Design a protein with these regions (language model features):
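Aromatic-anchored segments of alpha-helical transmembrane domains
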Residues: 18-26, 72-80, 119-128
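Hydrophobic transmembrane alpha-helices
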Residues: 2-68
Length: 195
């Protein structure tokens, strides 16, 4: 059996859509400027990026395309100050998503939706520093000019017990975002024989 390698087009698509998914997540994350909305950032990020991922899924025909995206996005979040845990977490969830897509032979909308749902747990990983380095995170917020009142309000809505619910909100946002993407792209998926 001949091993399929990535074409230049595959790599360009992976890079381009990684940046588009990251941009959609970044737009969703803007609600974080209002500290009481911080627990909902993973939900909004996944909801906003779901349609972009579903469009990307039409370009995925081999194992590794989601892993490339997860690696690029994890690196981008890591270098923008979201901690070191976001990269391995994003890569692990992207790898699990790869197996879900493969099980659906890269043609099943339902498998694609579940791939993105699982992957969207990663949108909560960018918040890990809030939970494990609280004091340092508060000081960083103050140093960046957000002020003590903003930091105190953020921490009041993100006590340690909220980590798992925040992760689950990311998955719910991913499921709904992928579903929204399916609805928006229904004609496109039918043309490709995926719907």
């Amino acid at each position: 059996m001949k091993k399929q390698s990535f074409s230049v087009k595959d790599l360009i698509n992976a890079g381009l859509f990684s940046l588009l998914v990251f941009a959609a997540m970044f737009v969703g994350g803007i609600i974080g400027f209002i500290p009481i909305f911080m627990p909902f950032i993973p939900f909004i990020c996944a909801l906003c990026s779901g349609p972009v991922f579903m469009l990307y899924s039409t370009k995925i025909h081999r194992f590794g395309m989601v892993l490339i995206m997860g690696t690029i996005i994890g690196l981008l979040f890591m270098v923008t100050g979201h901690g070191i845990y976001v990269l391995p977490g994003t890569m692990l969830l992207a790898l699990i998503g790869e197996y879900i897509l493969k099980k659906g032979n890269y043609e099943s909308l339902n498998h694609t939706r579940w791939c993105f749902t699982v992957y969207s747990l990663a949108s909560g990983f960018m918040m890990i520093p809030i939970y494990i380095t609280r004091d340092a995170y508060i000081q960083r917020l103050i140093d960046q000019g957000y002020g003590q009142a903003y930091a105190d309000k953020m921490m009041s809505v993100l006590p340690n017990w909220t980590f798992l619910p925040v992760l689950l909100l990311g998955a719910i946002g991913g499921y709904l975002g992928a579903t929204l993407g399916i609805k928006m792209l229904q004609k496109h998926f039918k043309k490709l024989g995926m719907a």
